[in-house]
Amino acid sequence: MSIIELKNVDVDFPQKKGKLVKAVNSVSLSIEKGDIYGIVGFSGAGKSTLVRTINLLQKPSAGDIEVDGTQFVKDGKQVISNKELQLKRRNIGMIFQGFNLLNETTVLENVAFALKHEKLSDDELEKKSLELLELVDLKEKANFYPSELSGGQKQRVAIARALANNPDILISDEATSALDPQNTQQILDLLKRLNKQFNLTVILITHEMDAVKKIATKVAVMEHGQVIEKGSLRQVFLHPKQELTKKFVGGSLEAISTLNSLHLDKLSKNESIYQLVYSVNNVAKSIIIELYKEIGVEVSMLYGNVELLNDEPIGTLVVLIKGDQEKQKQAKEFLQKQDVTLTRLDEKGNIYD
């Protein structure tokens, strides 16, 4: 069941001389309840602009928006009253890269601030705020000030505050971008736990594919305001169609670094380099040994890695295949039958044109 439906959403920003910049261009997404939906792309791709249309912090120029069964926008026009919109926004929590904490108040007071519209006694307010801090494993820091916390702890406070109204949706807008790897992992683990514990729908906006790989169930890739690819995380990771997606998912930076360090000579017509991406669970035997046995080509491994894709082990190999054109064709066909995704690379690790 979809909790968020975006259909043909545009966001136009007027410029001088009557020109328009199309920050979001005809985007359609269906996000189901309980998804961890990653939206990934480089800076300026339109990710943040798009997700801010969900709660109408950014008004769309065209399209339809429906959230949890309520129509917010129809044909680019707001159809929900401002009063009802204010109530509906309480069901959508948001966290940001910059934390947005009140520096002059304690951690407990920061969380309590999000409950100011509730008719709670002081004791009830404190109890509720402490419960939220306990949820993010930060109850012991209740009387600390933000300046006394690490970046990861500040983000935990922001998450506790975002959960104050028991939302069904949490939007994470580059929330881990300013954190070190350890704190990033802890925040991602927390988001995943909250997703499972409360069936919380999480929308993860990031330019870091690693964050999406670790916890997302579905992913959309954005470029120049458009969604160029979308699907389940496994589908997009194992079978990317667009070049940008291949760059995001392939561990290509490590592969490029490795190939550059090898200083390979220019490849002959009987030599090809391929990046192979596959599910370790589905490919039980050694791919290289099987290629040699079945096809008779010579295969050299140049790079190898195994990582977890939302708890599923995924292997990445970069191999040099030597053989005549017919043998190379047979090798490609054999690998594709094994559900291995192939991307041809040049000797420097770039995607082969």
Curated annotation (Swiss-Prot):
<keyword id="KW-1278">Translocase</keyword>
<dbReference type="InterPro" id="IPR018449">
    <property type="entry name" value="NIL_domain"/>
</dbReference>
<dbReference type="InterPro" id="IPR050086">
    <property type="entry name" value="MetN_ABC_transporter-like"/>
</dbReference>
<keyword id="KW-0547">Nucleotide-binding</keyword>
<feature type="binding site">
    <location>
        <begin position="41"/>
        <end position="48"/>
    </location>
    <ligand>
        <name>ATP</name>
    </ligand>
</feature>
<dbReference type="InterPro" id="IPR003593">
    <property type="entry name" value="AAA+_ATPase"/>
</dbReference>
<comment type="subunit">
    <text>The complex is composed of two ATP-binding proteins (MetN), two transmembrane proteins (MetI) and a solute-binding protein (MetQ).</text>
</comment>
<keyword id="KW-0472">Membrane</keyword>
<keyword id="KW-1003">Cell membrane</keyword>
<dbReference type="InterPro" id="IPR017871">
    <property type="entry name" value="ABC_transporter-like_CS"/>
</dbReference>
<dbReference type="InterPro" id="IPR003439">
    <property type="entry name" value="ABC_transporter-like_ATP-bd"/>
</dbReference>
<dbReference type="GO" id="GO:0033232">
    <property type="term" value="F:ABC-type D-methionine transporter activity"/>
</dbReference>
<dbReference type="InterPro" id="IPR041701">
    <property type="entry name" value="MetN_ABC"/>
</dbReference>
<dbReference type="InterPro" id="IPR027417">
    <property type="entry name" value="P-loop_NTPase"/>
</dbReference>
<protein>
    <recommendedName>
        <fullName>Methionine import ATP-binding protein MetN</fullName>
        <ecNumber>7.4.2.11</ecNumber>
    </recommendedName>
</protein>
<dbReference type="GO" id="GO:0005524">
    <property type="term" value="F:ATP binding"/>
</dbReference>
<dbReference type="GO" id="GO:0016887">
    <property type="term" value="F:ATP hydrolysis activity"/>
</dbReference>
<comment type="similarity">
    <text>Belongs to the ABC transporter superfamily. Methionine importer (TC 3.A.1.24) family.</text>
</comment>
<comment type="function">
    <text>Part of the ABC transporter complex MetNIQ involved in methionine import. Responsible for energy coupling to the transport system.</text>
</comment>
<keyword id="KW-0813">Transport</keyword>
<dbReference type="Pfam" id="PF00005">
    <property type="entry name" value="ABC_tran"/>
</dbReference>
<feature type="domain" description="ABC transporter">
    <location>
        <begin position="6"/>
        <end position="249"/>
    </location>
</feature>
<dbReference type="Pfam" id="PF09383">
    <property type="entry name" value="NIL"/>
</dbReference>
<keyword id="KW-0029">Amino-acid transport</keyword>
<dbReference type="GO" id="GO:0005886">
    <property type="term" value="C:plasma membrane"/>
</dbReference>
<dbReference type="InterPro" id="IPR045865">
    <property type="entry name" value="ACT-like_dom_sf"/>
</dbReference>
<keyword id="KW-0067">ATP-binding</keyword>
